Swiss-Prot record:
It comes from the Eukaryota. Pfam families: PX, Sorting_nexin, Vps5. Keywords: Acetylation, Cell projection, Endosome, Lipid-binding, Membrane, Phosphoprotein, Protein transport, Transport. Residues 1-104 are annotated as: Disordered. Residues 299-519 form the BAR domain. The gene is SNX2. InterPro entries: AH/BAR_dom_sf, PX_dom, PX_dom_sf, SNX2_PX, Sorting_nexin_N, Vps5_C. This is Sorting nexin-2. Predominantly forms heterodimers with BAR domain-containing sorting nexins SNX5, SNX6 and SNX32; can self-associate to form homodimers. The heterodimers are proposed to self-assemble into helical arrays on the membrane to stabilize and expand local membrane curvature underlying endosomal tubule formation. It is a peripheral membrane protein. The BAR domain is able to sense membrane curvature upon dimerization. Membrane remodeling seems to implicate insertion of a N-terminal amphipathic helix (AH) in the membrane. Residues 260-519 are annotated as: Interaction with RhoG. PROSITE patterns: PX. The modification Phosphothreonine is found at T101, T104. The lineage of its organism: Eukaryota, Metazoa, Chordata, Craniata, Vertebrata.
């Protein structure tokens, strides 16, 4: 019966080409996968590294027939046990985890598996990654700041250099606190290196801030005015957020290029990062070619999860863009309100100076002072609208583009696998024709080619399964971070609005006696 079933096999343990990139990502995995079969053995078993769901494209795995009395693994998850419980030992891996400073809880809630029939059971598998994430928490003891923008050089050869300061207790770094000077092209070069390593295997690489030819040209050839200062501050804040998101990723944090960027006093000059260059034009051509290929590839998606997520991100992208436009309009209106308030304050002050009535003149002068203070409040609120809300939306519009990029790479991986299968079929047909035509001298060559393409088909299948598995984990981590970021920003934004309104009330309450004193 169900209680006497043996645990599922642990797999043959064959490594794939991508498993070396999986190290360190366990801390941030929050995707929960639904099992098709769950034995009621007292010891939970880990899934094989290359296990795929029944909805995955390609050859289907052998189905397991379940008894009707399926158990709800979380039906009575009420018992608290120590982390040293023997029931956890088969799940936890002995492999070394990334050097982080974890926060380890003293107790952990463990579900008890009871032989209890449920009318509508929901069975979940708690993977090794999720157990470790729950035990260790999403904490990386590393703080990164970008500050002190400095103009280096003159004319069109000038550029902005930024100080990147890192504070950490992670053992992978040589010091606990260090700072380096980096220019904007260095940030672009870092993103290019990380994307070339990890994007095509399913990792979501945070995008770097976009180049602005107009804004940087003003900084290079123009004098230091308010617009140039505002542009430099926007870029500094964007670069800081980019690095903070990058080091939050457990796999990217361990990349040697990232550590070199943070620690090395001198970096090789980043090349092919200019917008108006041969490499820049080539990138635009490649993007256009990828868009055309995406339209021509017709992937038979049989995994409902991927189909649902792609539609979800398409809708989310559209709504975020609409909200971003609205918030930018709000920022513009707030700045206009600030300018009009300043003009009103100036006019009220001039009227107060020309007024003969002493009490009325004093009241008008006080009104002008209040309006000047309100003008400052409007400027601060416009600043909060932009840096708290608008920039968050802008970042996530680019992040969702990166998410859709990994889905596109999965489609390319499937297309490569499909092409290998078609080529293998043609090779087998050619071999059959040779055997019918009795050409023994070419049959051996055909057999060798068939073996070669069979290996390519198997490798393509493994690559596709691995990138699908990685994307599931990455999307789960992305969703968790997205909710956390929006919650934090919305709370801060509402607090700024409340503070602004409270300050307005104080200003008007202080002015009210002056208005009543007019006689």
């Amino acid at each position: 019966m169900a209680a006497e079933r043996e645990p599922p096999p642990l797999g043959d343990g064959k490594p794939t080409d991508f498993e070396d990139l999986e190290d360190g990502e366990d801390l941030f995995t929050s995707t929960v996968s639904t099992l098709e079969s769950s034995p009621s053995s007292p010891e939970p078993a880990s899934l094989p590294a290359e296990d795929i769901s029944a909805n995955s494209n390609g050859p289907k795995p052998t189905e397991v027939v379940l008894d009707d009395d399926r158990e709800d693994l979380f039906a009575e998850a009420t018992e608290e046990v120590s982390l040293d419980s023997p029931e956890r030992e088969p799940i936890l891996s002995s492999e070394p985890s990334p050097a982080v400073t974890p926060v380890t809880p003293t107790t952990l809630i463990a579900p008890r598996i009871e032989s209890k029939s449920m009318s509508a059971p929901v069975i979940f598998d708690r993977s090794r990654e999720e157990i470790e994430e729950e035990a260790n928490g999403d904490i990386f003891d590393i703080e990164i700041g970008v500050s002190d923008p400095e103009k280096v050089g003159d004319g069109m050869n000038a550029y902005m250099a930024y100080r990147v300061t890192t504070k950490t207790s992670l053992s992978m770094f040589s010091k606990s606190e260090f700072s380096v000077k980096r220019r904007f092209s260095d940030f672009l070069g870092l993103h290019s290196k990380l994307a070339s390593k990890y994007l095509h295997v399913g990792y979501i690489v945070p995008p770097a801030p976009e180049k602005s030819i107009v804004g940087m040209t003003k900084v290079k050839v123009g004098k230091e005015d308010s617009s140039s200062t505002e542009f430099v501050e926007k870029r500094r804040a964007a670069l800081e957020r980019y690095l903070q998101r990058t080091v939050k990723h457990p796999t990217l944090l361990q990349d040697p290029d990232l550590r070199q960027f943070l620690e090395s006093s001198e970096l090789p000059r980043a090349v092919n990062t200019q917008a108006l260059s041969g490499a820049g034009i080539l990138r635009m051509v490649n993007k256009a070619a990828d868009a055309v290929n995406k339209m021509t590839i017709k992937m038979n998606e049989s995994d409902a999860w991927f189909e649902e997520k792609q539609q979800q991100f398409e809708n989310l992208d559209q709504q975020l863009r609409k909200l971003h436009v609205s918030v930018e309009a709000l920022v513009c209106h707030r700045k206009e309100l600030s300018a009009n308030t300043a003009a009103f304050a100036k006019s009220a002050a001039m009227l107060g100076n020309s007024e003969d009535h002493t009490a009325l003149s004093r009241a008008l002068s006080q009104l002008a002072e209040v309006e000047e203070k309100i003008d400052q409040l409007h400027q601060e609120q416009a600043f909060a609208d932009f840096y708290m809300f608008s920039e968050l939306l802008s970042d996530y519009i680019r992040l969702i583009a990166a998410v859709k990029g990994v889905f596109d790479h999965r489609m390319k991986c499937w297309q490569k696998w499909e092409d290998a299968q078609i080529t293998l079929l043609k090779k087998r047909e050619a071999e059959a024709k040779m055997m019918v035509a009795n050409k023994p001298d070419k049959i051996q060559q055909a057999k060798n080619e068939i073996r070669e393409w069979e290996a390519k088909v198997q490798q393509g299948e493994r690559d596709f399964e691995q990138i699908s598995k990685t994307i599931r984990k990455e999307v789960g981590r992305f969703e968790k971070e997205r909710v956390k970021d929006f919650k934090t920003v919305i709370i801060k934004y509402l607090e700024s609005l409340v503070q602004t309104q409270q300050q307005l009330i104080k200003y008007w309450e202080a002015f009210l006696p002056e208005a009543k004193a007019i006689a």
